Amino acid sequence: MNDQNERRLETLSGQVSSLKNVTYDIYSRANDYTRIDRATESFSGLSNSVKKSTENFFRVVRSAGRRRIMTMVLAIVGSILIIYYASKWFF
C-alpha cells in the first residue's frame, strides 16, 4: 500500500511539475506578445508622426516658394554632411 502511494505521489509530482512548466511557458509567451504589441503600437505612432510631418512639409512647400524651400533643405543637408565629414577628419 505504501509503495502504491509512493508511485501515485511521484506521478502526481511529475504532473504538477509539467503543469508548472506549461504555466511558465504561457506566462513567457504572454510577455512576448505584450512586448510585440507595444512595439507595434510604437511603430504605428512613429508612422503617424512621419505622415503628419510629411503633410506639414508639403503644406509649407505649397504655401512658400519652392525654390526658397529647396535652398533651405539643401543648406541644412549640406551643413549636416560638412559637420559629419569634418568630425570624421578631426577625430
Curated annotation (Swiss-Prot):
It is a single-pass type IV membrane protein. GO terms for biological process: intra-Golgi vesicle-mediated transport; intracellular protein transport. GO terms for molecular function: SNAP receptor activity. The chain crosses the membrane at residues 69-86. One of its GO terms (cellular component) is Golgi membrane. Residues 1-68 are cytoplasmic. Keywords: Golgi apparatus, Membrane, Protein transport, Transmembrane, Transmembrane helix, Transport. Its main location: Golgi. InterPro entries: BET1_SNARE (IPR039899). Disulfide bonds: none annotated. It is found in: Golgi apparatus membrane. Residues 87-91 are lumenal. CDD domains: SNARE_Bet1 (cd15853). Vesicle SNARE required for retrograde transport within the Golgi complex. PANTHER family: GOLGI SNARE BET1-RELATED. Component of a SNARE complex consisting of sed5, gos1, ykt6 and sft1. This is Protein transport protein sft1. It comes from Schizosaccharomyces pombe (strain 972 / ATCC 24843) (Fission yeast).
